[in-house]
């Protein structure tokens, strides 16, 4: 009986210690929201790096629980706005983010409906908000 209890306890201890340890390192970027509507009527990319600039993000219903005041000390935020489109099927997002010694390079991916593809006949204003977990200079391509 004691051997069975000891074997069970040993297996329990080994299985508990085998779990992965999280290094606590944040990813280079996080997509905070990607929406088909709600963006501006013109195409633009904006980098927010000051505390007063993120107040509008904190007031947004989709972002208020994702953006904290202290985030601006270690992060920048990027708004990617596709502009007004006459139909659905359009989106804007991040294809990749690369970090070099002195800057962060964001490659933007725009998606549009293909010729003849069925889409909704409603105006759309796609946008994406990205959190970059770095204070390096940001270059958008």
Model-assigned labels for residue ranges:
Residues 1-24:
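Bacterial Sec-dependent N-terminal signal peptides
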């Amino acid at each position: 009986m004691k051997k069975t209890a000891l074997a069970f306890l040993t297996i329990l201890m080994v299985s508990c210690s085998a779990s992965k340890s999280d290094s606590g390192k944040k990813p280079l970027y996080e997509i905070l929201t990607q929406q088909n509507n709600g963006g501006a009527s013109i195409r633009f990319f904006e980098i927010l790096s000051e505390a007063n600039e993120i107040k509008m993000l904190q007031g947004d219903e989709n972002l208020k629980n994702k953006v904290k005041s202290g985030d601006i000390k270690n992060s920048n935020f990027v708004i990617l706005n596709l502009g007004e489109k006459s139909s659905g099927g359009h989106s804007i997002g991040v294809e990749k983010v690369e970090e070099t010694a002195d800057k962060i390079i964001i490659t933007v991916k725009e998606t549009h409906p293909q010729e003849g593809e069925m889409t909704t006949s409603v105006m759309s204003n796609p946008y994406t908000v990205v959190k970059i977990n770095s204070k390096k200079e940001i270059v958008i391509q």
